[in-house]
């Protein structure tokens, strides 16, 4: 067992990805240095309470608002979120990053009645999930469920077709890319949902998920997201 542990420690060293200190993927000092974001409309970026979609953008979008914790434009935030997408041994780091999100939500007093909301992590297609072996948004959602006392649903929202990476596309292409990529498999009429994702850029993916939920009768659809890429909208 000691030999296996040494091999594991060699292959996957437990060092802070910010400063290199041992025994953690993200030390307290580097966690405090992560750039937090203020609340703003997820589409036009105008300041808004709780990150609610502003009146103007409500006319064109289905998502009611988005809590976003971290600024993805900060190199360290970008590095951490990118690594958690494809390296499952960094699961503990996802928990660390989600702490920044839970802190913001708790301070806001947004969840006065957590039992009214159901968490829906943005899904992968079955093929992509099998290839990767995990979905990082489900891990984030599990942490939020435990920290905030929310319900978690992994079956209602499904991704039915593969899409290109949104980061490679312009705004019009992003909207077209995610069009009709989600389907609803259970009754959602009158229910309130919170979508969970690791990153938002234009908001097209979250808005598409909100659209299909509301087409089936969902009442409110918000989003909880780790980071926002402010360099590309």
Which functions belong to the PLM regions below?
Residues 1-196, 201-233:
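Glycine-rich phosphate/pyrophosphate-handling loop used in enzymes and phosphotransfer proteins
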